Design a protein with these regions (language model features):
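Periplasmic-binding protein-like
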Residues: 32, 109-113, 202-249, 251-274
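A conserved helix-loop-strand patch within extracytoplasmic ligand-binding domains
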Residues: 63, 92, 103-155, 160
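Short beta-strand-to-loop elements that line the ligand-binding cleft
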Residues: 64-71, 157, 174-182
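Extracytoplasmic small-molecule ligand-binding "clamshell" domains
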Residues: 23-93, 99, 257
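Bacterial N-terminal signal peptides that target proteins for export
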Residues: 1-11
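Bacterial N-terminal signal peptides
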Residues: 9-19
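A ligand-binding cleft/hinge motif common to bilobed small-molecule-binding domains
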Residues: 73-77, 90-100, 165-170, 184-187, ...
Length: 274
């Protein structure tokens, strides 16, 4: 009888330990193609702000995390199909996306900007920052000026992004919008002269402009708010409320300990933490 009880107890403890192991395994989807948020080095290893932040958050959550590479245009579908449990891929928190998935609190602020080649007719446009959450008279004037400047121009963007949505919204008229699978392809065609301008996350396009060795310059406003969202956060399935809570608590801890600021300064060159 004693042996039987010990056997049952051993099985019970083993089941508990096994359950905890599985409960603490988290798969995080990332693109690996959007520096400095997430990218790969020459040896193919994932690097970037979010790669290091993911590792820190997983330590705070006491979780064993695996990074799963996913093309950008399949990022949200992949989450919903349970290919991974969370998204950390420079994804802006927008009302449109929140109809489909949940987001953690933001961990980094972002904006968007146009980039052109030096000497372009679009170079030197008004660089006033505009927040599209509040379309006051000054913002409306800037949008009208942009509509005039972009008329007849080809603007290149990564597909399935807030940047594509903005250009196709009618807020800046109807420029020709050319889409690409990755931001790298946008950058290559911009330099090759197949785009009059590229629109992207300001941190990503600045990183390219500074490191490409090409005469790429930023022009026009820095866009934020409205269709550009409220910062970047972790994307999580609607029904994973416990995981959402764990990520939020881990982000709080990382912020309090200065880890997010440290990583932002390392990868962005300034403190873009939220």
């Amino acid at each position: 009888m004693i042996i039987f009880k010990k056997t049952i107890l051993t099985i019970f403890v083993s089941l508990l330990l096994t359950a905890n192991v599985f409960a603490d395994k988290i798969r995080i989807g990332t693109e690996g193609a959007y520096p400095p948020w997430n990218a790969k080095n020459e040896s193919g290893k994932l690097i970037g702000f979010e790669i290091e932040l993911a590792n820190i958050l997983c330590i705070y959550m006491g979780a064993e995390c695996t990074l799963v590479e996913q093309d950008w245009d399949g990022m949200i579908p992949g989450l919903r199909l349970k290919k991974y449990d969370a998204i950390m891929a420079g994804m802006s928190i927008t009302e449109e996306r929140m109809k489909t998935i949940n987001f953690s609190q933001g961990y980094a602020s972002d904006g968007a900007s146009l980039a052109v080649m030096k000497g372009s007719a679009l170079e030197g446009m008004d660089t006033s920052a505009i927040n599209l959450s509040n379309t006051d008279s000054a913002t409306k004037k800037i949008l009208i000026d942009l509509t005039t400047s972009l008329a007849g121009k080809t603007v290149c963007v990564q597909t399935a992004t807030i940047h594509q949505n903005f250009l196709e919204s009618g807020l800046v008229g109807k420029p020709t919008v050319r889409t690409y699978k990755t931001q790298d392809e946008v950058n290559l065609d911009l330099v090759a002269g197949r785009c009059d301008a590229g629109l992207a996350d300001i941190l990503a396009i600045t990183d390219f402009a500074e490191k490409s060795g090409k005469p790429v310059v930023l022009t026009g406003p820095v866009y934020s708010g409205g269709p550009f969202g409220a910062g970047v956060g972790v994307g999580i399935r609607k029904d994973d409320t416990d995981l959402l809570k764990r990520f939020n608590e881990a982000i709080d801890t990382a912020r309090e300990q200065g880890k997010i600021s440290e990583l932002a300064i390392k990868w962005f060159g300034f403190d873009a933490s939220m």
